[in-house]
Amino acid sequence: MRRSIDDLPIADLPPGVEDDVPVSWAVAICDDYDDATPRVVLTVEEIGRAGTGLVAHLSPEHARRLRTALRDALVEVGEKAD
């Protein structure tokens, strides 16, 4: 099973960013593993260079940790926590 959840190209970089490479991220679910355990798949790659990015196969525990880190970062920049 593979199912895409969300994706977004991010080309609007803030001024002053020195390593200004526009990237795209995608989140999917996949269970194409020897143990058939579903995992969250996070892909980050440079826009226009499909297939050359980094892919993280996250267990539910690691996906929750990433979710918590993103929530905490949003709070740090003044956004309300969900």
Question: PLM features: residue spans?
Answer:
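Positively charged, low-complexity terminal tracts
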Residues: 1-82
